[in-house]
A protein has these predicted regions:
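Extended recognition/assembly regions associated with phosphoester-bond processing machinery
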Residues: 1-174
Length: 174
């Protein structure tokens, strides 16, 4: 995603400036001496009939160390970050006849239900949450972080960090 500042004359855009996302251009790979993990989730779609509650329940049991073999439980103990890259909820009115697929037709309730699920993740693990096209905000990028007006229960959680889309996040830094 880039931003272009310029003038549109007939069918030609004259660019005066290009705005690049906040992403570094160097490609230096940094590694930790410790075995640590980051989990990337997206498209939970809480509130939709397409949400997978049984699978998410298994994830919650695993991240809490209650599911999996010895190696899998060892990995769950070393999770330091969970990123959720958009579409926490299914939203309302996102596409025609969406209401036929919704189990929860109130977007505020969808966010409350989502928070109840995410509260089951150990509080020492930061949850970095980025919005998506089904979340309650504008679809076009860049998107601001999720609003307290809609997602207050998530904002109230001590381990939640709301970020914009796109955004740059520095983890495990000294």
């Amino acid at each position: 995603v880039i931003g272009v500042v310029g003038v549109n004359v007939e069918s030609v855009i004259f660019a005066n400036n290009i705005l690049w996302p906040d992403v570094p251009t160097n490609r230096e790979l940094k590694k930790s001496d410790e075995e640590k993990y980051a989990i990337f989730l997206s498209d939970l779609h809480v509130g939709s009939s397409k949400f997978l509650p049984e699978d998410f329940d298994k994830f919650l049991k695993w991240i809490n160390g209650d599911l999996g073999n010895e190696q899998q439980r060892s990995i769950s103990k070393n999770v330091d970050y969970i990123f959720i890259a958009g579409d926490l909820v299914d939203g309302c009115g996102i596409y025609p006849e969406q209401d036929k697929e919704l189990l929860t037709k109130d977007v505020y309730q969808q966010y409350r239900d989502c928070a109840k699920l995410l509260e089951q993740i150990p509080e020492h693990i930061p949850l970095i949450i980025c919005p998506g096209n089904h979340d309650a905000l504008r679809i076009s990028e860049p998107q601001p972080q999720l609003s307290k007006d809609y997602a207050k229960p998530l904002h109230d959680m001590n381990n939640v960090v709301m970020v914009s889309n796109p955004s740059m996040v520095n983890i495990n830094s000294t």
